[in-house]
Structures are given as C-alpha cells and as structure tokens.
Amino acid sequence: MSKEQRARVDALLRQPRPEGPRSVEALRAGFEALMTQMIVPDALRLTRTTLGGRPALHVEPDNGRRAGTILYFHGGGWVYGSPETALSLTGNLVARTGFEAYSVDYRLAPEHPFPAAIEDTVRAYRALLDSGVDPSAVAFAGESAGGGLAVTTCLAARDAGLPLPAAVVAFSPGLDATRTGESMDTKEGVDPIFTREAVERTGAMYLAGADPHQPLLSPAVLADLTGFPPMLLQVGTNELLLDDSTRLAARARAAGVDVILDVTAGVPHVFQSFAGVLDEADEALDRAAVFLGQRVGGRIRAGRAARASSPAENRSAES
C-alpha cells in the first residue's frame, strides 16, 4: 500500500463529522453517501427480487457464471446499509469467482431489533434451499455487521436443523456485543472510522435491552462452533473490532473448524471496500475468491424457483 493510497482513504474516512449523536436518518444518509463512492466492477447484471419474503439484489456476472451462490449480508451496524451500499463488495466477489450472489435487504434496528435480522437471513437461506440450490454450492458472506450475520446465520441454521453452507467469508465482522475485546480500547484513535461510543450506540439499538451474553449476539466469546463449515475471517490491524475476529478464530480452531484468520497490517475497517484504490483491498478480495473457489461446489438442482420470480418482483436494477 503506497502512502498516496492510504492518504486517499484516510482523507475519505476522517472527514469532519457533526458533533454529538446523530439521528438514525442522518446515520443512514451518511453511510449511503460514503459507500456509494466505492468502485463497483463492470460487467455485472443486477436484478431486484425477493428472497424469503425480503427484498434482495441478485448480482450475476454478465458473461456467464459458475455453479455457486453467495448469500451476502451488508454491513451498517444492524442500523443502516442496504444491498446497494455493499455492492462494491458483492460485485467484486461475483466478478472474481464467477458465482451469483443474493444480497439480502434484512430488517434494521431500531425499528426491528434483534433477532429480526437473523430471522430474515435464515429465511433467505431456507428459501434458497427450497428453490433447489444445493447447500454445498452456497457460501455466506458479509462485511462488518453483515460479517457477524454470516456467522450467526450459520449458527441459527445449524440449530434449526438446516444443512450448512459450504463456506463462510466475513470481512471485519462484528462478533461480540459484550464489547470485551482488548482492541476496543487499544485501537481507539487508531481506527479512523469507529469509536467505542459509536459502536455501543448502534449496538444498543440492535440489542433493544436483550442480554448481549448469548451466542447469537456474541459468538466470538460464547458460540459453540461445532460442525461449522470452513471460514475465512479478514480483518485489519487498525480496527476496534480486531479481537472479534481473533477470538472467533481461536474458538473455531478449538472446535475443529477449518478457519483462516487473514490479518492485514495498517488498514481500516472493511478495507476491502476500497478495491481499485488500495492494493491490499484487491489482494484480500483475490484471496477471498480463491477460498470460495476451493470450497464451494456441488450442483444446481432442478426447480430453481428463486429464478422464477414474478415480473413485478424480478426487474432490472440497471438504469
């Protein structure tokens, strides 16, 4: 990573912000303004659809695809974000793997606190399976809060008796609602995006009074990961959430899970979003694509109902 590249990223992330707490509407607008600046690959086909009763964005390579499906969960602290704000990440995974992706527009807090998001993502996965997608051809992926959902959706699916996906990829995941990781304090001021206060504020909206000491909220410290599929956890050394990934990786190894902890020095939260700007972002996405290509296989069974949405539900998202 050149100094010039890092300067561009720091300038973007450290823009002056309003003093004091911001409204949910302001948080959502600010996040959308930031994330829509990210570079999205060309040659993608985008279709708005529904999956498990929720809106979703279907992303495909424009030049034909391989047999594989990424179920993607966007970030945004469980309070903001959408499939559109994550399109750089979803699109880059699709472009690099040749797989299709469904990015789920799950319900957000504070209007819909825990466990609404997990209920939506599990329903989306169940809908994929019901449509004929083989679980060995599915990977869960997401960034930040969505990276946490990639893990907790897998937990909830396992506990519901569903067959598990072939792999999980989590970019800078949020995995500990107890906020007990040392990096929550040691990276304060180093992280150009988050402060403990900001993380705890959005976290409280998601919790809405729920006890954070439960596996679906704090898998890094409480989850039994027995039987989990292979996982790739990518995180930067400058993140408040660094220890969320390091502790989950340790729990996964203790449970016999095939896990790769991929730590990149000197980069911010969800640095993969800066593909085309940061060399490390492109390199990390390449590694994620290799990981997925090696672990996602299987076949597409007959009866792909997910592709047979009504015209009203399945319309081009391109302008």
Predicted regions and their residues:
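A glycine/proline-hinged amphipathic helix-loop "lid/cap" segment
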Residues: 1-64, 293, 297-319
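Short beta-strand element of the alpha/beta-hydrolase
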Residues: 67-76
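Short amphipathic alpha-helix adjacent to the substrate-entry channel of hydrolases
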Residues: 84-102
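Alpha/beta-hydrolase active-site loop
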Residues: 112-131, 288
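Alpha/beta-hydrolase fold nucleophile elbow
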Residues: 133-144
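Glycine-rich nucleophile elbow surrounding the catalytic serine of serine-hydrolase chemistry
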Residues: 142-154
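Hydrolase active-site cap/lid region
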Residues: 155-213
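Short beta-strand/loop motif that positions the catalytic acidic residue
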Residues: 233-235
